[in-house]
């Protein structure tokens, strides 16, 4: 085994010639020897007065963080609990509970009691061109005799001679009576039917 293994000054394995199970056993034995040698060196250094460097303290953060008093007593102080309770409570924005911002919906009775008859919408302001009536046209025709010739080319004398006065053209408004109207229409129809029957009974002349 010593022939196949070469160890340096630092105790590191330089070369392994064997392979397989025996080689692994040999490597394990050499590693155990090196570990025991390191343990002896460290014990000798401590006996000589050399102190190993201190281990760094383990730091904890986040939810696992505790104060010295809480670690000793095993119970968290009330101040820390109050702070955490305030932090975990649901916070509402300031001014959200203002009653002035809430809209008020009127009751149905109040809406019905309002008098809507007095509320009249303003009429639209539309300029309408005034249309001349027949009376205005007659007055203009009587005033301006030159109107009988239109544009100096068209002669309207024939039309003005045929025009009838207003009293002859206008009809009086007479109310219709249903019974009277029915009798008049029925009598006219009967006379027409009688005339038609008489014409059918007349014999045709023989040629």
From Swiss-Prot:
The keyword Cell membrane is assigned to this record: no
Keyword annotations from UniProtKB, A to Z: Cilium biogenesis/degradation
InterPro entries, A to Z: IFT43
UniProt signal peptide: none
Location of the region described as Disordered in the Swiss-Prot/TrEMBL record: 1-104
Domain of life: Eukaryota
GO-annotated cellular components: cilium; intraciliary transport particle A
One Pfam family cited in the UniProt record for this chain: IFT43
GO biological process: cilium assembly; intraciliary retrograde transport
Stated role: Component of IFT complex A (IFT-A) involved in retrograde ciliary transport along microtubules from the ciliary tip to the base.
Family designation: Belongs to the IFT43 family.
Quaternary structure and interacting proteins, as annotated: Component of IFT complex A.
UniProt protein name: Intraflagellar transport protein 43 homolog A
Protein source organism: Salmo salar (Atlantic salmon)
This protein's encoding gene: ift43a
